[in-house]
């Protein structure tokens, strides 16, 4: 990963998303434990095993963060370890830069394994909500279901 990108101040410099099928939940949990043991400076993110939720991530996954801004210097070590130990899972490693979510999850991202179809439209909805737009689908305000 390009470590010279303009990273966002005050945010984790990079995220790791490990995607898994529902029947591989235990195997994914084992990978997460190994990842945390090997890189104890990573921060634990969310565990989302509910596919179909309104999210840019189309399938179950767990997330880890490079917590400290200095951790960006170590991201390529994590990527190399994951290449050897990913256990067949599709993994997305992306920076959090001033370029925004769409570019961070596409142009600047590193995929290990088969890429999954990121739902980029969700980022656009999230941006609309941030700037105060209220979008409705049927009788539901988008703000209430994200």
Pin down the residues of each PLM region.
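Short, intrinsically disordered low-complexity segments
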Residues: 39-84
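N-terminal, charge-rich interaction modules
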Residues: 1-26
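Charged interaction segments
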Residues: 68-146
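Short beta-strand element of the conserved SAM-dependent methyltransferase core
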Residues: 18, 62-66, 93
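Broad gene-expression machinery/nucleic-acid interaction feature
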Residues: 13-15, 61, 88
């Amino acid at each position: 990963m390009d470590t010279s990108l303009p990273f966002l101040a005050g945010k984790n410099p990079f995220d790791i998303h490990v995607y898994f099928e529902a029947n591989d939940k235990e195997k994914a949990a084992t990978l997460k434990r190994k990842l945390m043991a090997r890189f104890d400076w990573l921060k634990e993110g969310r565990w989302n095993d509910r596919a179909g939720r309104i999210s840019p991530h189309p399938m179950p996954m767990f997330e880890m963060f490079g917590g400290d801004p200095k951790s960006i210097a170590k991201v390529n070590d994590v990527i190399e370890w994951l290449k050897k130990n990913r256990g067949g899972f599709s993994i997305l490693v992306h920076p959090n830069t001033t370029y925004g979510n769409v570019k961070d999850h596409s142009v600047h991202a590193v995929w290990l394994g088969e890429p999954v179809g990121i739902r980029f439209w969700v980022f656009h909805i999230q941006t609309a909500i941030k700037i105060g737009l209220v979008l409705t689908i049927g009788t539901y305000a988008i703000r209430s279901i994200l």
